[in-house]
Amino acid sequence: MPLRVHHLDCGTMCPACARLMNGRGGWLEPAKLVCHVLLIETPRDGLVLVDTGLGSLDVADPSRLGAAFLALSRPQFDAGRTAVAQVRALGFQPEDVRHIIVTHLDLDHASGLPDFPLAQVHVFEPEFQAAMKPNWRSKARYLPAQWAHSPRWSCHAAGGGERWFGFEGLRPLPGLQDDILLVPLIGHTLGHCGVAVRDDAGWMLHAGDAYFYHGQLAEQPHMPAGLRLFERLVETDRRLRERNRDRLRELALSHAGEVRVFCAHDPVELAGMRG
């Protein structure tokens, strides 16, 4: 039985200037970015989330997210868009979510972890270490309150994986080892990963924040100036980020019929994956 994948927006953000961030729209019009979350129905392992978007605790008390994030991202706080609310709207219960796979632990990706306290949280080992022991520069991106409930962490180390379209692939879930893979894509953070998922239409790759705009994977790469600046402001290693972005572009162009690649914040890609 193939996996069934739901594509959710669990946190719309409206930073200033659509023209500079989305590449279209007015100079004074707010931009639109999304938090693209996957909810996966599995035959035997319950539900699996890939990322969580903005969670109910932070929606109820936005000050938890910090003044800088609020001023820059200008999120729309809607309890109905949280992953836990959308899980319920689909007829499930929060405890049905047995696994959460995070691309990384930035506050807009891990905010919903407390809404699923029984879930096992899968993360790439270098990302876990970076978040638990942040340096002065990375403290702003990680929010310890989002894991104050002591999640059931499952850390996955590099090595011992297999090749997946030229990338390293780690198997986080033994029962779904043929259908879900962690794909290290370092650069945005020290332990950033994509998550490859196979459904009845083939492979898809949730690339997290390895890139931000669909035009970056085009034959003639392009990107709005404001979003390019933001991408550089939040990167950890530019050389690795650009190298992995270029590898993703090659993957998307060379295997367009085999792999659907999308990132975490592009509303155009979210709409395309929803069909």
Where would I find each of the regions flagged by the language model?
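Cap/insert and terminal regions of metallo-dependent hydrolase folds
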Residues: 71-85, 201-275
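Feature marks short, surface-exposed loop/turn motifs that line or immediately flank catalytic pockets
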Residues: 14, 56-58, 129, 212-214, ...
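Core dinuclear metal-dependent hydrolase active-site scaffold
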Residues: 7, 37-42, 48, 158-200
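Active-site metal-binding loops of divalent metal-dependent hydrolases
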Residues: 52-55, 105, 127, 187-189, ...
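Conserved nucleotide-sugar donor-interacting segment of glycosyltransferase catalytic cores
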Residues: 110-120
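Metallo-beta-lactamase
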Residues: 75-108, 120, 125-184, 233-258
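Conserved beta-strand hairpin/beta-sheet module of binuclear metal-dependent hydrolase folds
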Residues: 3, 12-85, 195-208
